[in-house]
Amino acid sequence: MTRIKRGSIARRRRKKMRFFASSFRGAHSRLTRTITQQGIRALVSAHRDSDRQKREFRRLWITRLNAVIRDMGISYTYSKLIHDLYNNQLLLNRKILSQIAISNSKCLYMISNGILQI
């Protein structure tokens, strides 16, 4: 029996992983087994950190909003603002509200006053 090496399918799979790991350093970009292991590890880290990033940005937006609202001088907090926004069915999420708070805090002040008057 002659020796049969794996065909084009396995080569294609290894080539795809090698291209994915081409920016890795050392053996992680040269040896097939370590390329596979590091590729899996990189994807796991990317998935975990994308969830973490969403969490951290949401926390940042909430902190910014709360800081701007408390600086207004009204006895008004972030939680009351969000509660009143939902009760009045205003579709402004935390990201947009924090961008408004950073760029133009007077606009946020007008929004909160409008909610209080309703």
Curated annotation (Swiss-Prot):
A single GO cellular-component term on record: ribonucleoprotein complex
Task: Report which superkingdom the organism of origin falls in.
Answer: Eukaryota
CDD domains named among the record's database cross-references: Ribosomal_L20
Tell me yes or no: is RNA-binding among this UniProt entry's keywords: yes
- Quote the InterPro entries the UniProt record gives: Ribosomal_bL20 (IPR005813), RIBOSOMAL_L20_CS (IPR049946), Ribosomal_protein_bL20_C (IPR035566)
GO biological process, alphabetically ordered: translation
Which molecular function terms from Gene Ontology are attached? rRNA binding; structural constituent of ribosome
Which UniProt key words apply to this protein? Plastid, Ribonucleoprotein, Ribosomal protein, RNA-binding, rRNA-binding
> What subcellular compartments does it reside in?
Plastid
Family statement:
Belongs to the bacterial ribosomal protein bL20 family.
Q: What is this protein called?
A: Large ribosomal subunit protein bL20c
Query: What organism is this sequence from?
Result: Cuscuta exaltata
